Amino acid sequence: MEHLVLTIDDSRTMRDMLRLTLTGAGFRVVQANDGAHGLEVLEAENPDLVVTDINMPIMDGFGFIEHARRLSAHRVTPILVLTTEANAEKKARARRAGATGWIVKPFNPEKLVTVLRKVAP
């Protein structure tokens, strides 16, 4: 069964790269351009996994994770952070919010796919 992945990033280029990588690995992909849009897609599409950036307009990745974890249907949905941030404080904040893991951009496509398959329900 193909897992459905929600990718959230304000960069169209990054969304395109994620779609290409993940569909090539057999995942189905839905996308959002910020955390607020991500919450709409999360509730409408009910993805199996989420990959989110941190630094985005309207609602950042921390806000998205915190809101997603308040939704009973997504309390345990794996949420990976994919960001240029390497700051230990931000990484700890993401974990406290409920992130499953953290990958720093630029990402290695094979590593991302491996991690997603590992945490997939």
Indicate residue ranges for each PLM-predicted region.
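Conserved acidic segment of CheY-like receiver
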Residues: 2-13, 18-22, 50
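Active-site beta3 strand of CheY-like receiver
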Residues: 45-51
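Short, glycine/charged-rich "phosphate-handling" switch motifs in NTP-dependent
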Residues: 100
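Short hydrophobic/Thr-rich beta-strand motif most characteristic of the beta2 strand and flanking loop
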Residues: 26-33, 41
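Receiver (REC) domain active-site loop signature in two-component systems and cognate sites
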Residues: 56
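Active-site residues of response regulator receiver
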Residues: 53, 83
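C-terminal output helix
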Residues: 107-116
